[in-house]
Swiss-Prot record:
It comes from Bacillus cereus (strain G9842). Involved in phosphonate degradation. It is an enzyme of class 2 (transferase). GO terms for biological process: organic phosphonate catabolic process. Its cofactor is pyridoxal 5'-phosphate. The keyword Transmembrane helix does not apply. This is 2-aminoethylphosphonate--pyruvate transaminase. Its EC number is 2.6.1.37. Belongs to the class-V pyridoxal-phosphate-dependent aminotransferase family. PhnW subfamily. The gene is phnW. Homodimer. It catalyses: (2-aminoethyl)phosphonate + pyruvate = phosphonoacetaldehyde + L-alanine.
Length: 365
């Protein structure tokens, strides 16, 4: 239980702790040595969360939403003569395709249904057939549905065929254990307001140093030039090129400390996993079925199929908001769904309160 006006059962922005909010009550200077030292600590902590082989990787922080960081990677990493293979089964994979097209990058798509994971057989077929592909991108947890994609297999194939690997781990990093060195990920992207439980305002890229160094001069945007942003942070002890979200950075630093206190990524995963299992079991008791097969379901967010013809999501949303909960509408076109997030400062008692509210007639009645 927390002191928020509403409990956000969403995939980010999400419900944060009181202590994360409190550090934003103060003002900070972007040129201050103490602040820039904190930025460097944040960068180092992110690398240590991502891999045991810390010397091979570095972190770049980028102002804006997570999408800004994804576009920074797509626009800075792929050369003019490069070609990108995007594995997509939801809105965020499609967004990467849209970015590539807007940036006039050659792109090929491996498309699967939104409730099915990336098809590894098709990915390999495309890699075999198209020798011009230089980079491969995949979304780890596609929050359109809550499905988990097989990034281990995708990245293994990418390296087998000599490609640079890009993983959008926006909604999974910090909540699902991975080692980017073991998985051979060259660029991993996430955001402050997801599983680490900070607030919106910046994203980050954890990059293999060798690959990042190849990006010098390739940026297609001034403000989203990944290499230039990294070089400034490296040479000027945590300085951002342009005004940084100081309050958000302090909140994120506090959130990192709280992740460590909770027991790290494994402990947080266990909490999210237990939240999700409890949610599905209890929702099942009152007639709601999840969209995604259990073996592909993430612990991050769950899509539920409308229980009957004539079901009104807006009624559900409005009534649950009266009970103190905020949830998400569906985001797929072929099946009517709504979504409930399991992440943030959310615990089993919160899930029970939510389902109790629904069972009392907050939705159907």
């Amino acid at each position: 239980m927390n002191e928020n006006h509403y409990l956000l059962l969403t995939p980010g922005p999400l419900t944060t702790t009181k202590s994360v909010k409190e550090v934003m009550l103060y003002d900070w200077c972007t040129w201050d040595v103490e602040y820039n030292t904190m930025v460097q600590e944040v960068r180092a902590k992110l690398v240590s969360l991502a891999t045991k082989e810390e010397e091979k990787y570095t972190t770049v922080l980028m102002q804006g939403s997570g999408t800004f960081s994804v576009e920074a990677v797509i626009g800075s990493v792929i050369p003019a003569n490069g070609k990108l293979l995007v594995c997509t089964n939801g809105a965020y994979g499609k967004r990467i395709v849209q970015m590539a097209e807007m940036l006039q990058i050659d792109v090929v798509v491996s498309q699967t249904e939104e409730w099915e994971p990336t098809n590894i057989v098709e990915v390999e077929k495309l890699l075999q057939e198209d020798k011009e592909i230089t980079h491969i991108a995949v979304v780890h947890c596609e929050t359109t549905t809550g499905i988990i994609n097989p990034i281990v297999d995708v990245c293994k194939l990418g390296k087998q065929y000599g490609k640079v690997t890009i993983v959008d781990a926006m909604s999974s990093f910090g909540g699902i254990e991975i080692d980017i060195a073991d998985l051979q990920i060259d660029f991993l992207i996430s955001s402050a307001n997801k599983c680490i439980q900070g607030v919106p305002g910046f994203g980050f890229v954890i990059a293999k140093r060798d690959e990042l160094l190849k990006c010098k001069g390739k940026g297609r945007s001034l403000s989203l030039d990944l290499y230039d942003q990294w070089e400034t942070m490296e040479k000027q002890n945590g300085k951002w090129r342009f005004t940084s979200p100081t309050h958000v950075v302090h909140a994120f630093y506090q959130a990192l400390l709280e992740l460590e206190k909770e027991g790290g990524v494994r402990a947080r995963y266990n909490r999210y996993y237990n939240n999700q299992k409890l949610l599905v079991n209890r929702m099942g008791e009152i007639g709601f079925k999840p969209l995604v097969d259990e073996k592909y379901q993430s612990p991050i967010i769950t899509s539920f199929i409308y229980p009957k013809e004539g079901f009104e999501f807006q009624q559900l949303y409005n009534e649950l908001k009266r009970y103190g909960f905020v949830i998400y509408p569906g985001k797929i076109s072929k099946v009517d769904t709504f979504r409930i997030g399991n992440i943030g400062d959310v615990h089993e008692e919160d899930i029970n309160r939510l389902v109790d509210s629904i069972a009392k007639g907050a939705v159907i009645g």
